[in-house]
UniProtKB/Swiss-Prot annotation:
Belongs to the ATPase alpha/beta chains family. It is an enzyme of class 7 (translocase). SUPFAM superfamilies: C-terminal domain of alpha and beta subunits of F1 ATP synthase, N-terminal domain of alpha and beta subunits of F1 ATP synthase, P-loop containing nucleoside triphosphate hydrolases. GO terms for cellular component: proton-transporting ATP synthase complex. Produces ATP from ADP in the presence of a proton gradient across the membrane. The V-type alpha chain is a catalytic subunit. Its EC number is 7.1.2.2. The gene is atpA. GO terms for biological process: proton motive force-driven plasma membrane ATP synthesis. This is V-type ATP synthase alpha chain. It comes from the Bacteria.
């Protein structure tokens, strides 16, 4: 423990002297109030400290005391359904302790509740040899999550005592005699420094798709479990709604939602909506698998920088249990702005647009902690972390540094488009500029598992949209009547794909989520109509005849997005009606 004194205060940056015994990344208690800070730079005996609380009122001469520990999070039962700030202070218990709606400075509240007793079921025998990552037992944390208690990193030996029963998270549950003869007394909780990635046994190639229930994502721009995706877009294009939708309905075991520097109302929406929503995969409330980290725009800037690391460390902990985890960061641009502010106060040489030169490596550091891994310990298991980051480029300009550095690392780009949002087409993901490098592998995976020709259907649908884009210019110049019947049919089919398939209402109880089976049935109907109508044109029918003769069936196709999942047969029989209607047109018209 080192004690120094403040010599300079500049916003969230405090400089203290007499700190020659301190280490970089040590946590400090700053000033008489004991504000939490982290050492980010050392020069001789002077330490630059970024303070995670409001620094107004601090002055030179006040004490600074180091704890000798890095910024760490507590990992154990009690994380799920909780809402923390950027440095893992529980907001509900913080309010109870301070009787204040705002964060009172210098108050210490344990991250995990020390009073709740959790029922621990041991799955291991006394005398058994264990090592890092081995599962010792489970705690039923919620109806959905079985919290697995693992041997902490760096501990191995023989179990000399372990018991099932009810324990608080700081009571000794098991004892291990280590190889050097010393004893390790373990609790249900462990600590881990947030800036250090948790180790794994082996990195694996992600293959299984993350099913989100959002048709434009699952069909055209899929992300795998263990993949990384970016959602850049201008203000009002729907970044937060896309993130909320994925957080609500993704087929993962755990969701960690980091609200980083965005509006407080958006976190309020999450708190109001999530408890009422039922997870289609488990039938339980979505909050029973969710951890929220709220670091809204009016909270201290430095804590924004920590919130991303806090979230990804929690995600790694659940991954080590063998779970699939999705982490949403909304928005990484605000996190980058926090980096820029601290860099400016440190008087570092600025890079592009004032961001620090190390922006790219920091962004890469975050996304590289995602992935599919074989984790340490027995029984052998795999875990995945899928990282989805929103990016808010000023004015929607994706050539700015945060977006460009993000796109260098992630493999999926869901580009939100202001003109689409203005036309009320949501999700406003532009199908011409977005891309997914997982598309082929996901298509092959689905074709093999579901025994379908999903990959070829997606390719055909995308071809229609691309052809529509090239025809639109002709239509704008000389009008739609100048097109041939074949080209007009192409425009009509592309319109059906856009409006009846890609457009989705997040606020409709049925349309908000679409299972893979329903997605395939809807797309198959559109492509069946395309095949039958093209066939009719070849046999001499006119485009207007086909449109007039299929009004009713096309209306049913458009309404199929509002047909509930338990009535899928109603969607599947539409293809027979399409064939029947086209046959009637051929019998009564054409050549």
């Amino acid at each position: 423990m080192t004690q120094g004194k403040i010599i300079k205060v500049s916003g969230p940056l405090v400089i203290a002297s007499g700190m020659q015994e301190a280490n970089i990344q040590d946590i400090c208690r700053v000033g008489k109030l004991g504000l939490i800070g982290e050492i980010i730079e050392m020069r001789r005996d002077q330490a630059s400290i970024q303070v995670y609380e409001e620094t107004s009122g601090l002055g030179p001469g006040e004490p600074v005391v180091t704890t000798g520990e890095p910024l760490s999070v507590e990992l154990g039962p009690g994380l799920i359904s909780q809402m923390f700030d950027g440095i893992q202070r529980p907001l509900d218990r913080f309010k109870l302790a301070t009787h204040n709606d705002f964060l009172v400075r210098g108050v210490e509240v344990p991250s995990l509740d020390r009073d709740i007793k959790w029922h621990f079921d041991s799955t291991i025998a006394i005398g058994q040899k264990v090592s890092t990552g081995d599962i010792l037992g489970t705690v039923k944390e919620t109806e959905v999550v079985n919290h697995k208690i693992m041997v902490p990193y760096g501990v191995s030996g023989x179990v000399v005592s372990i018991a099932s029963g009810d324990f608080t998270i700081d009571e000794v549950v098991y004892e291990i005699k280590k190889l050097d003869g010393s004893f390790y007394k373990g609790t249900l909780m462990q600590k881990w420094p947030v800036r250090k990635a948790r180790p794994v046994s082996k990195r694996l190639i992600p293959e299984e798709p993350l099913i989100t229930g959002q048709r434009v994502i699952d069909a055209f721009f899929p992300v795998t479990k263990g993949g990384a995706a970016a959602v850049p877009g201008p203000f009002g294009a729907g970044k937060t709604v896309v993130q909320h939708q994925v957080a609500k309905f993704a087929n993962v075991d755990i969701v960690i939602y980091v609200g980083c520097g965005e509006r407080g109302n958006e976190m309020t929406d999450v708190l109001n909506e999530f408890p009422e929503l039922i997870d289609p995969n488990t039938g339980q409330s979505i909050m029973q698998r969710t951890v929220l980290i709220a670091n809204t725009s009016n909270m201290p800037v430095a804590a924004r920088e920590a919130s991303i690391y806090t979230g990804i460390t929690m995600a790694e902990y659940f991954r080590d249990m063998g779970y699939s985890v999705a982490i949403m960061a909304d928005s990484t641009s605000r996190w980058a702005e926090a980096l820029r502010e601290m860099s400016g106060r440190l008087e570092e040489m600025p890079g592009d647009e004032g961001y620090p030169a190390y922006l790219g490596s920091r962004i890469a550091e975050y996304y590289e902690r995602a992935g599919r891994s074989q984790v340490l310990g027995l029984p052998e298991r795999e875990g995945t972390i899928t990282a989805i980051g929103a990016v808010s480029p000023p004015g929607g300009d994706i050539s700015e540094p945060v977006t460009q550095n993000t796109l260098r690392i992630v493999k999926v780009f869901w580009g939100l488009d202001a003109p689409l949002a203005q036309r009320r087409h949501f999700p406003a993901i532009n199908w011409l500029t977005s891309y997914s490098l997982y598309k082929d592998s996901v298509g092959t995976y689905i074709d093999g598992k579901e025994k379908t020709d999903w990959n070829s259907k997606i390719t055909r649908a995308m071809n229609y949209l691309q052809r529509e884009s090239s025809l639109e210019e002709i239509v704008r110049l000389v009008g739609i009547d100048s097109l041939s019947d074949n080209e007009r049919l192409t425009m009509e089919i592309a319109k059906q794909i856009r409006e009846d398939y890609l457009q989705q209402n997040a606020f409709d109880s049925v349309d908000t989520f679409t299972s893979f089976a329903k997605q395939e049935a809807m797309l198959s109907n559109i492509l069946t109509f395309a095949d039958q109508a093209n066939h009719a044109l070849e046999l001499g029918s006119y485009f207007t005849e086909i449109m007039e003769g299929t009004v009713a069936v096309r209306d049913r196709m458009a309404r199929s997005k509002y047909v509930s999942e338990d009535r899928l047969d109603e969607i599947k029989i539409i293809s027979n009606e399409i064939t029947h209607q086209i046959h009637l047109i051929l019998e009564t018209g054409g050549l």
